[in-house]
């Protein structure tokens, strides 16, 4: 409940909050006002999706940045296993992809069908995002056991070859 007594995180029949609907529409000022009033930045709907996911999938860069500033979980997974990073990579949005990575999104996360953000970007032919994610994977694997590092880096090289074919 907000300071004014309004149920700020009340959900509609689909499980969506006002924050989610504002993020979906790219209403950055409304998103910020709701967050300042105490809206839960990481509230989930019935499919496990968050306001950040709605902003990402609809390419609302300024809304994404606002949600990140208010602590949105960049590694949250919806019921299907998808993450905001996978959604950004699948949409071909390098600016949002980079913002998510800069905020700590893990490029190693695998969704239910067994795909990473890198695989999604590769399948859709987004070469610049593939290169960005390959670099992020290399950084993410530093300090891991050599066997894991080799497997992940080998995966990235395989993906790079597939993109160039």
Q: What are these model-derived regions, one by one?
A:
Residues 46-49, 53-70, 75, 79-80:
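Alpha-helical adaptor scaffolds
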Residues 3-7, 103, 112-115, 119-165:
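Ankyrin-repeat-protein effector appendages
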Residues 27-35, 60-68, 93-101, 127-134:
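Ankyrin repeat structural motif
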Residues 21-26, 54-60, 87-93, 120-126:
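Ankyrin repeat A-helix N-terminal signature
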């Amino acid at each position: 409940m907000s300071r004014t007594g309004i149920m700020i995180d009340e959900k509609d029949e689909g499980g969506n909050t006002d924050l989610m609907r504002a993020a979906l529409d790219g209403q950055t000022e409304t998103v910020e006002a709701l967050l300042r009033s105490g809206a839960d930045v990481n509230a989930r709907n019935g499919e496990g999706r968050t306001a950040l996911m709605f902003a990402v999938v609809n390419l609302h860069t300024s809304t994404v940045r606002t949600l990140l500033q208010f602590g949105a979980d960049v590694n949250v997974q919806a019921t299907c296993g998808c993450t905001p990073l996978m959604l950004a990579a699948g949409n071909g949005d390098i600016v949002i992809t980079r913002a998510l990575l800069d905020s700590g999104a893990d490029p190693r996360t695998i969704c239910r069908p067994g795909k990473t953000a890198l695989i999604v970007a590769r399948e859709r032919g987004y070469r610049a995002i593939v290169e960005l994610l390959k670099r992020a994977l290399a950084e993410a694997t530093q300090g891991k056991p050599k066997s894991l590092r080799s497997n992940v880096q080998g995966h990235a090289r395989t993906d790079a070859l597939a993109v160039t074919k």
